Amino acid sequence: MDEIHHDLTYSDKPHTTFLKAAPEAEDISLIFTAATKTFNIAGCHTGTTIIPNPKLRSIYDREHAAFGKTPNRFGMIMTEAAYREGAEWLDQLMDYLENNKKIFTSAMKSIKKLNVFDLESTYLAWVDFS
């Protein structure tokens, strides 16, 4: 499950992780997340994989190693710094995105055949063209 936008939630819409929403799927779940979208550090090539099932984790680790993947130390430092020191910046970003959401939704209302879904998170909009 891709939860890369999990940090980009609006104040009235908290994120619910897939594992909390569907605990019965824990044994077959892989959750992927990263600070890259939130803090614009995609160039660091880092991410986090959450795998509750030890057997599945072992398979994942083996396959990951087979591709010669090793941890990116610089990316790990950037991620840690972003989460430790970036709260104020993230708050400002969310205020900015909230304003953009209002502007976009208002503009789309003028186009009769388009319907914008209520944005609960992220900077992406879902628009119904049908």
Roles of regions detected by a PLM:
Residues 19-21, 47-53, 84:
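Short beta-strand-to-turn element immediately C-terminal to the catalytic PLP-Schiff-base lysine
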Residues 80, 89, 95-108, 115-129:
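Conserved glycine-rich beta-strand-loop-beta hairpin in the small C-terminal domain of fold type I
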Residues 54-59, 73-92, 129:
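Amphipathic alpha-helix from the class-I
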Residues 5-41:
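Active-site pre-lysine segment of PLP-dependent enzymes
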Residues 1-3, 33, 48, 118, ...:
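Short beta-strand segments
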Residues 1, 64, 94, 101:
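Short amphipathic alpha-helical/adjacent loop interface patches that line ligand
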Residues 24, 51, 55-74:
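Active-site C-terminal subdomain of aminotransferase-like
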